[in-house]
Amino acid sequence: MLEDYKKHCKEREEMGIPPLPLDAEQTANLIELLKKDHKESDFLLNLLKERVPAGVDDAAYVKAGFLSDLTKGKTDSPYISREDAVAILGTMLGGYNIQPLIDCLEIDGLADDAADALSNTLLIFDAFNDIFELSKDNVHAKRVIDSWANGEWFTNKSEVPESIKLTVFKVPGEINTDDLSPAPDAWSRPDIPLHALAMLKMPREGIEKPLETIEELKKKGNPLVFVGDVVGTGSSRKSATNSVLWHMGDEIPAIPNKKEGGFCFGGKIAPIFYNTLEDSGAFPVECDVSKMEMGQEIIFEPFNGKIFDASTNEVISEFNLKTDVLLDEVRANGRIPLIIGRQLTDKTREALGLEPTDIFRRPDQEDKSTKGFTLAQKMVGKACGVEGVRAGSYCEPRMTSVGSQDTTGPMTRDELKELACLGFSADLVMQSFCHTAAYPKPVDVETQHTLPDFIKTRGGVSLKPGDGIIHSWLNRMLIPDTVGTGGDSHTRFPIGISFPAGSGLVAFAATLGVMPLDMPESVLVRFKGEMQPGITLRDLVNAIPYAAIQQGHLTVAKKGKEK
């Protein structure tokens, strides 16, 4: 195993990327090596700590089982003490590591370390009840509950700095998600470092050798900021965000081949791309970027809403954050961890009979309008248990239908594992195989064989290759007046309403059964007269942007974009 792995490392190193994370079989072999003396013990230990996926991956199951046995004295290793085992369990996000950590709360000498680990773990889900029950007569479990109630998982993280020096990586014109994550390379999307090599590979005006330029700019010693006039239009690809963050984000301890953080400034940032950046802990800002140039060093002041040229101290752009909650999202390493953590803190405080905490910035929910609600606002309101939701309000509607298609399915699977999802909370989670059915690559064939069981064991529905297209299946299964989501255009609901999302948010909606949403504006479109022979529903859909262009609500030119 070790020889094969080193050979694989060498092949990947030649491409300038890290090796793939360990699978369950490799992890099992690694554990056998760690149980006895070995001359490469540091290398092996690093593999166990840093190169095994977290959450509910099969390899994580093997890793958690071994560490659990170490804590209970059922096995031993010359390189990992019982205390070390608890600390490593604490880096595994959630899922298979939770029960071993709960068990450690009752083991002398390990309970303190286990309490520290659980205090900073957010993906607790149903285990909350076990820990809360235990806290009634176990001081260590009580410490975990108090820590969650005080939001220490959040307050222990460093605040967003008042001033950040960045180096500009600017791509002129409109950058769509196909530029960042090309469709012909869809097969490699789950392998984030490999797929990131395809970023901006299509020749375009104003930029040559983009990846070499990125490496050159990093030598200035500042974080890079991705800058564009119009950023992230087109299909909602989480892979596009993954690629940008792979080149410009921060490493995540104990999570192999994935990064978080980063900065993205755009004259306009497409809404779904903006949300996907938020989810990943990046800092997206819409502002005038006309005075920013490739390689320029700038000072970014998030609280003052100003960006300066670092050499002249001249203000080159001013901005307003879409919401102050963004500052909390960046501090929490992403909107998804913030939502899950905030819910955990709120739930704990409610169970203890405490008032809601004021440590988080909450979305402004004041309803100033006295008008009625649009049909869309009523449907979303129904999913939130209220009469309606105004445009611009933040809400978390219940997801009745969630669709996943096969070119993003493997990425959604990885996100589900990281969310420690062992069962879906949305009523319908459906996986299709319509994109890869006709001409599958070898990697697609493997997906077709492995993904259906993954979806079905969590309570979802999986179609078979050849069963048909995701749209027509969803259309038959939708329930009127309900809300759903799915991978981008695979969410056009003829009844009910849907909001498109990248694969990370699709996984979140499937796991928790709700989805974070800043309610968009409603637009009333009314067709008059009779449908003419030969005119299809697709023609009617295309007539909407055509009419918007004629009325000046939608512009095609890249400068001064109106949407």
Regions found by a protein language model. Name each.
Residues 35-39, 72-80, 103-111, 134-139:
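Short coil turns that connect the paired helices of HEAT/ARM alpha-solenoid repeats
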Residues 38-62, 77-79:
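An N-terminal, globular interaction/scaffold subdomain
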Residues 22, 40, 51-55, 82-88, ...:
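Ligand-binding pocket scaffold of soluble enzyme catalytic domains
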Residues 2-31, 326-339:
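Amphipathic alpha-helical packing elements
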Residues 27-35, 397-403:
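Amphipathic alpha-helical segments that form the core helices of the histone-fold
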Residues 40-44, 48, 81-88, 114-118, ...:
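Conserved hydrophobic register position within alpha-solenoid helical repeats
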Residues 97, 101, 106, 113-563:
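Fe-S-dependent hydro-lyases/dehydratases of central metabolism
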Residues 24-32, 54-73, 92-106, 123-135:
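Amphipathic alpha-helical scaffolding segments comprising HEAT/armadillo-like alpha-solenoid repeats
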